[in-house]
Amino acid sequence: METTNAKTKITVQTTVNSPVSKVWESFNAPEHIMKWNQASKDWHCPASENDLRTGGRFKHTMAAKDGSFSFDFEGEYINVIENKLIKYVLGDGRTVQVKFEGSGNQTHVIEVFDAETSNTMELQQTGWQAILDNFKGYTEAA
């Protein structure tokens, strides 16, 4: 974690044993997002919309499987470079950058996001890393 301009940045990352084109597709196609986008097995992503282009918007519904709670994770893309970079701003003004570094049949995915103030840094990092780990497992198995 690093602090820049009074905003704390948190980094999560993984290496996926798949080529960058497959990783990009799994990361961005709604039919894939709904299968991997949860931090734990008692949550799921029942809906996903994604207009992947600079100026486009996305919305992923995150919900407890028991129906007790749900929220929409949404924002607007401010930079999209196919197979390389996604940068977006969330509804609360925080920014997220996702880099894809492909090398043969492996792709390193690095997410850097502005921390929010409601949860501890450790909880945020753990939650985002769990989702990224689910993404890795799903993409490698597909």
Residue ranges and their predicted role:
Residues 14, 47-50, 73-78, 95-102:
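Hydrophobic/aromatic beta-strand elements that line small-molecule binding cavities or substrate pockets
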Residues 11-12, 31-68:
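Short beta-edge strand/loop motif at the mouth of beta-sheet-based domains
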Residues 28, 132-140:
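Short amphipathic alpha-helical signal-transduction/dimerization elements
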Residues 1-43:
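Hydrophobic ligand-binding cavity/cleft-lining segments
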Residues 20-21, 52-53, 78-83, 99-108:
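A short, structured loop/turn motif at beta-sheet edges
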Residues 23-24, 33, 58-60, 77, ...:
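Hydrophobic pocket/interface hotspot
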Residues 85-131, 135:
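Beta-strand/loop substructures that line and gate deep hydrophobic ligand-binding cavities in soluble
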